[in-house]
Amino acid sequence: MSAYRKGNIFIISAASGTGKTTLVSRLLANHNGLRVSVSHTTRPPREGEANGVHYHFVSKEEFESLIAQEAFLEYADVFGNYYGTSTEGVNALAAAGYDVILEIDVQGAAQVRNALPEAVGIFILPPSFDVLAARLKGRGTDSREVIQRRLSKARHEIEQSVLFDFVVVNDDLEKAEGDLLHIVNACRLKRSRQLGFIADLLENS
């Protein structure tokens, strides 16, 4: 966290099964100054997920009430479940100097880029569709029909990677984490993100 600058906002998207969540978790655990925006969702919690940590789990009625209040920076219906990013939560973290990670799908990413053109888009790619299919099957949480739907959707999502600023191939977790960190550090060093420090330096020269 920096006292001199507003935090960057990083949009990290990927097709389901690419390892996005694992990568983001490693980045948060191993590096300072980063916070993840905890999304709201109407889907049931998976084993090991905690409310307020992995997601804010809410009912469909609660979610639709928040939509009516314009509380979301973006939201989407994904396979019958709502997912949304709180505008207030993101703004508070960025204002405090944290770099904020939005772990969202390509539909939500487009909404955020329209609202926040300065946000940095990062797309995580699988090394191949065979590896992606194996990862989805290995999770053991989805039926064969759902897996086929996810693979079909993955092709469309990967086509949308052209709309992002950076792409990272997740073939090796450690290398992919390092690639993500390089992107984060490069964005932190942009002159436009150091204006507060420069002004303070000149004022006290």
Curated annotation (Swiss-Prot):
CDD domains: GMPK. SUPFAM superfamilies: P-loop containing nucleoside triphosphate hydrolases (SSF52540). Residues 7-185 form the Guanylate kinase-like domain. GO terms for molecular function: ATP binding; guanylate kinase activity. Belongs to the guanylate kinase family. It comes from Neisseria gonorrhoeae (strain ATCC 700825 / FA 1090). Disulfide bonds: none annotated. Its EC number is 2.7.4.8. ATP binds at residues 14-21. The keyword Cytoplasm applies. It is an enzyme of class 2 (transferase). GO terms for cellular component: cytosol. InterPro entries: GK/Ca_channel_bsu, Guanylate_kin-like_dom, Guanylate_kinase, Guanylate_kinase_CS, P-loop_NTPase. It comes from the Bacteria. It is found in: Cytoplasm. Coiled coil: none annotated. Keywords: ATP-binding, Cytoplasm, Kinase, Nucleotide-binding, Transferase. It catalyses: GMP + ATP = GDP + ADP. It holds the Pfam family Guanylate_kin. This is Guanylate kinase. The keyword Kinase applies. Essential for recycling GMP and indirectly, cGMP.
